[in-house]
Amino acid sequence: MEDVELTLTPDDYSLLTDLYQLTMAACYVGENIDQRRASFEITVRRLPPRCGYLIAMGLAQALDYLEKLRFSSAQVEALQSIGIFDHALAQFWTLLREAQFSGDVWAVPEGTAIFANEPLLRIEAPLWQAQLVETYLLNTLNYQTLVATRSARMRDVAGADATLLEFGTRRAFSPQGALWAARAALAAGLDATSNVLAAVKLGRKPSGTMAHALVMALSATEGTEAEAFTAFHRYFPGAPLLIDTYDTIAAAHALSDQIKAGNLQLSAVRIDSGDLGSLSRQVRAILPGVAIIASGDLDEWKIAELKAAGACIDGYGIGTQLVTGSPVNGIYKLVEIDDIPVMKESPGKITYPGRKQIFRRVENGIVQRDRLSLIHETPDHEQPLMQLVFKQGQRMQESDSLSTIAERTRASVASLPPSVRDINQPESIPLDLSDHLSALIEKTRRKTAES
């Protein structure tokens, strides 16, 4: 097969979907229901293991996708050439050529803590449009919510004063995923990313240290580890140095001697291997005025262990465990069509009918419970979480800044009870179903059984 360019651009958005979204759209056209008003909601049935909450993230990219979704003539011709749509009506091709998202979008703001069975986002649009966008929306919301949740948990465990650096680009699932991961991490409270492209695009200063390769290469060619450090500081004065290539403690002593002699200014050292707790305490005694950064497959549990063991660590470089991990299995399900509520009743995969709102009860700054209600219901000393962000295909407002989202994340996590923030055996916030929603569930079940 001939090699082709597979780098994603906004021009590709229309075809970045599963085939069945297009075949269903063609069927809707044939059955003359493609323009029926449909509502789909994204929810998560179950939280990932040992996770008491999720941090919603990815809305900005979802709205960007909806704004730019178009089919080019070449893309329509490509679909026509594959032989799958030979029986599709001519109106289907006209629909694609003129495609532009014209619906409404309701969503919880990025950085908001949410729980199982609560909608992150709702699409209200002509049926064929609402169907088509499922794949991309789940892709961006699921992944960024995963990274944001892990970032928020690590920040919660490490504390507000710790420096947290996103180092996950090499372990992310794709170059695009690496950019989304960097954004989600920064928006959920991490201090910086090593991903240069992400940092530049997001208006942030990238952060990083050095790799063992530089120490080994310069040690081999210039004589010693100390000379490798001197060479690096010649171009990046005071920059953090990686000191565990050969002997962490010996390197720390050598640097201490240079500092005492007035020959060196040093902002930080990084330790990437060994017993991080023990090594950090020894290095702190040798270099008391130098920040210590730890890295090496760290996650919230390892950070908690290090803190409990009295490790002298000022910052953490977090990579693999941040950008991978247990997936967020968000689902995108039809809840209403032409004002007719619908629900799925498969065992273990039940969905709730109707367009819904989340009402959150907060007392003395702490979340007490959530209530899942229908959109016509009103709050009872509660906060409505879902907001109208897109109306008739147009944004209602500009996307929030990363700093705004990061502050929302911080406040949202701080409002959760300690039992929900626990990283080992977390509880979840109680979710009540309103009387109106409960009645609608029973009514929809009876109607389904009768039909």
Over which residues does each language-model region extend?
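Glycine-rich phosphate/ribose-binding loops and adjacent secondary-structure elements
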Residues: T209, A213-V367
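Ordered alpha/beta subdomains of enzyme catalytic regions
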Residues: M1-Y235, Q265, I331-S451
